[in-house]
Regions:
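Short membrane-interfacial helix/loop motifs at transmembrane-helix boundaries
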Residues: 268-280
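Structural core segment of the AMP-binding/adenylate-forming
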Residues: 1-17, 117, 121-187, 200
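Flexible, non-catalytic linker and terminal segments flanking ANL/adenylate-forming cores
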Residues: 1-47
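Conserved pre-ATP/AMP-binding loop-to-beta segment of ANL
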Residues: 63, 180, 191-210, 217, ...
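Conserved AMP-binding loop of ANL adenylate-forming enzymes
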Residues: 100, 104, 239-267
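Conserved AMP-binding/adenylate-forming
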Residues: 72-74, 89-136, 251-253
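AMP-dependent adenylate-forming
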Residues: 50-78
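Conserved AMP-binding A3 loop
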Residues: 75-77, 206-230
Length: 280
């Protein structure tokens, strides 16, 4: 695989659990990935959570409004603090190691966004799932990705618990409430609001996005930290061209890459505000 940074695939990976990387095509079958544009000059070490969220707080933008939901409104600093606390829960209470797959289940909400950032900060791999999926479909995803951890909206726990009976790898599950209550919030409330992001490689996998399976069994597509930042550097400024006070809103779920990009990754990459239209 050819890259602008000159690093070989997997060089310096931070992942302890290498299950996902081992499922990539062998290097001779990988495409040449050319990052030649000025905005795509990524170094060999990259954690996209640092770039999408932490850098804004470090640059003095922490008080700026970031996410609005039905139950809460967070600034960039508040989102960072919540994500840091949840990352600590994942690592300290749930035993997450870099490279573990974490299933995320919930409607669009600031809390689900914080969970996504927590997984990425901790070096995990986020596996978003549609709220409408039932136990059989969830079990297929857990089995294919060998998911080990899950963070789930308490209102959607029943189907995940049914799926869990068929999935021996899924040993760690915590539930959250979009209004800030629930088991996960209780654990997070005792944690410091700081977290040292895992020093992931630019080509470490941070996301497995499953297709809808309309033509057969859903397939998991693997995305690197660098992929997330490359999309953020290209599409918003050159196609969408948002203005300074624009607010992002939409109905696509964060489990779809279209929703994850359009409602979370792209707005935060350019210091904008997202209003979540619905939470289930």
């Amino acid at each position: 695989m050819s890259t602008s940074s000159g690093t070989a695939a997997g060089a310096g990976t931070a992942h302890v659990d290498t299950f996902a990387r081992e499922r990539l095509p062998p290097p001779p079958q990988m495409p040449d990935l050319l990052f030649e544009l000025p905005g795509l000059q990524f170094g060999p070490r990259l954690n996209c959570a640092s770039e999408l969220l932490d850098r804004w707080v470090a640059q003095g933008q922490g008080a700026r409004a970031c996410l609005i939901g039905a139950h809460r409104r967070w600034s960039y600093a508040e989102l960072q603090a919540e994500a840091n606390r949840i990352a600590r829960v994942l690592v300290e209470d749930m035993g997450l190691v870099p490279g573990n797959r974490v299933l995320l289940r919930g409607g669009n909400s600031p809390m689900l966004a914080a969970c996504w950032f927590a997984v990425v900060k901790a070096g995990g791999i986020a596996v978003g799932t549609m709220p409408l999926l039932r136990a059989r479909e969830l079990a297929a995803i857990v089995d294919k990705a060998q998911v080990t951890h899950a963070l789930c909206d308490a209102r959607l726990a029943e189907e995940l618990e049914l799926a869990r009976r068929q999935c021996p790898t899924l040993t760690q599950v915590r539930h959250f409430a979009v209004d800030g209550g629930g088991e996960l919030a209780a654990l997070a409330s005792s944690k410091p609001a700081t977290f040292a992001n895992v020093d992931t490689a630019a080509d470490d996998i941070c996301l497995i996005a499953f297709t809808s399976g309309t033509t057969g069994v859903p397939k998991g597509t693997l995305h690197f930290h660098r992929d997330v930042m490359a999309a953020s550097a290209c599409w918003p400024p050159h196609v969408l061209r948002p203005r300074a006070d624009d607010v992002f809103i939409g109905s696509p779920p964060l489990a779809f890459t279209f929703g994850l990009g359009g409602l979370l990754v792209f707005p935060l990459a350019w210091l904008f505000l997202t209003a979540f239209k619905t939470e289930l």
